[in-house]
Amino acid sequence: MQYLGIDLSNTDANLLFVSDGREQKLSLRTELCRDKREDRWYIDAEAYEKALAGRGSMVQGLLAESERDGLLVAEDTEYRAVELLARFLKLARKQVLGDEKAEELRTVIVLPDYRLAFVRELAALLPQFGFPAERTRLVSREESFLAFISAEPALLAAGEVGLFDLAEKSLCFYMA
């Protein structure tokens, strides 16, 4: 079985891929770059190379604009932010998986704020970007923490479970 966890924020995405006991971690900026010459999108180092060379247009703030049902502009074209976020997730998955087959991949995407209308829209879009609905789950950060502590009863009983959440504008500590 293969698992992919994606913890999203407006600036970063942290990915953890687990397959056959092997783990791979990756941290990416939550940004996209659209190539000026062709309809191709890039993330991470490739995105910065294109933008610095003047061959691409960077798009930032994907999560915040998606939650507001906003529009973002790349190369004089307006895009729905939620569609760009789904495109980013597809490219991020491809980067962490590489050439590995992902037929039984189960994906959990952790969101800092769980806004139902946004989550429903993103969940409806993700299958178009290769995330099967039956194997993709969108959860809040709090829900992911609760799932973790419920799976660790010994740590919970000893009072040894805590979580720091450092975001752009806040620092939260959750204790169980």
Protein language model regions, located:
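Phosphate/oxyanion-binding active-site loops and adjacent basic polyanion-contact surfaces
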Residues: 58, 78-89, 118
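Phosphate/ATP-binding catalytic cores across multiple sugar-kinase/actin-like superfamilies
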Residues: 84-100, 145-152
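Short glycine-rich phosphate-binding loop at a beta-alpha junction
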Residues: 101-113
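A short acidic Gly-Thr/Ser loop motif
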Residues: 6-12, 157-172, 176
